[in-house]
Amino acid sequence: MSKDDVIQMAGEVVENLPNAMFRVKLENGHVFLGHISGKMRMHYIRILPGDKVTVEMTPYDLTRARIIFRAK
């Protein structure tokens, strides 16, 4: 899968879950499971409920996504 296949969207973290997983709500109301990308783990970027984030979703599984950016 190339990087052109991913879908980027903006959302808000609703809930922290174990193992660095988060419940994220998109602007259109869709709620799904998100995990932190590797670079965010490497740089110890913390995510809390209420944070605005950018997520990447694959067209194959729209119930999970990778959190790639946390807005300030």
Swiss-Prot record:
User: Domain S1-like: where?
Assistant: 1-72
Entry similarity comment: Belongs to the IF-1 family.
| Cell compartment(s), UniProt | Cytoplasm
Pfam families with a match to the protein in the record: eIF-1a
NCBIfam families the UniProt entry points to: infA (TIGR00008)
CDD domains, per database record: S1_IF1
Write out the GO cellular component annotations. Answer: cytosol
Which keywords appear in this protein's UniProt record, sorted alphabetically?
A: Cytoplasm, Initiation factor, Protein biosynthesis, RNA-binding, rRNA-binding
Summarize the subunit comment: Component of the 30S ribosomal translation pre-initiation complex which assembles on the 30S ribosome in the order IF-2 and IF-3, IF-1 and N-formylmethionyl-tRNA(fMet); mRNA recruitment can occur at any time during PIC assembly.
Name the record gives this protein: Translation initiation factor IF-1 1
Q: Name one GO molecular function term.
A: translation initiation factor activity
Q: Which PANTHER family match?
A: TRANSLATION INITIATION FACTOR IF-1, CHLOROPLASTIC
Its function, per the record, reads: One of the essential components for the initiation of protein synthesis. Stabilizes the binding of IF-2 and IF-3 on the 30S subunit to which N-formylmethionyl-tRNA(fMet) subsequently binds. Helps modulate mRNA selection, yielding the 30S pre-initiation complex (PIC). Upon addition of the 50S ribosomal subunit IF-1, IF-2 and IF-3 are released leaving the mature 70S translation initiation complex.
Q: Highest taxon of the source? A: Bacteria
